Amino acid sequence: MLLKSTTRHVHIYAGHVVDGEVHPDTETLTLNVDPDNELEWNEAALAKVEAKFRELVANAAGEDLTEYNLRRIGSDLEHFIRSLLMQGEIGYNLNSRVRNYSLGIPRVNHS
C-alpha cells in the first residue's frame, strides 16, 4: 500500500518514482512541490522548502511511518510555503491554470 500525504502545494509519497510512476518503498520519501504550478518559484525558495522537508523528516525519525505522520509533515511544509509567499520570496503564477489564491489574496505594494 502506498502511504502518501497531499496538500494543495505539497505531495509526499513513501516511495520512489520510476518513469513517472510511484513505487511504494517505506525507506524513501518523495516530495513533489506545487504540482499544479500555482506559484512562481526560484532555486533559492525551492532549496529552502527541500531543506525544511529534510528537517521535518529528521525530526520525525524513530516515529512510525503512517499517513498521519506524513500529513503532519505535509501540513507543516504547506505553512512554510505560505510564509515564503507572505515574505515575498515566491509569488502566485498568474499564468497557471489554477488561480484560487489558496494561500491568501495577493498583496500589491504601492510605491
UniProtKB/Swiss-Prot annotation:
Topology of this chain in the membrane: Peripheral membrane protein
Keyword Protein transport: no
Main location, first listed in the record: membrane
Keyword Transport: yes
EC number: 7.1.1.-
Reactions it catalyzes: a plastoquinone + NADH + (n+1) H(+)(in) = a plastoquinol + NAD(+) + n H(+)(out); a plastoquinone + NADPH + (n+1) H(+)(in) = a plastoquinol + NADP(+) + n H(+)(out)
A GO molecular-function annotation: oxidoreductase activity, acting on NAD(P)H, quinone or similar compound as acceptor
Family matches, as Pfam families: NdhM
Highest rank taxon of the organism: Bacteria
Known role: NDH-1 shuttles electrons from an unknown electron donor, via FMN and iron-sulfur (Fe-S) centers, to quinones in the respiratory and/or the photosynthetic chain. The immediate electron acceptor for the enzyme in this species is believed to be plastoquinone. Couples the redox reaction to proton translocation, and thus conserves the redox energy in a proton gradient. Cyanobacterial NDH-1 also plays a role in inorganic carbon-concentration.
PANTHER family: NAD(P)H-QUINONE OXIDOREDUCTASE SUBUNIT M, CHLOROPLASTIC
Entry protein name: NAD(P)H-quinone oxidoreductase subunit M
Lineage: Bacteria, Bacillati, Cyanobacteriota, Cyanophyceae, Acaryochloridales
Gene behind the chain: ndhM
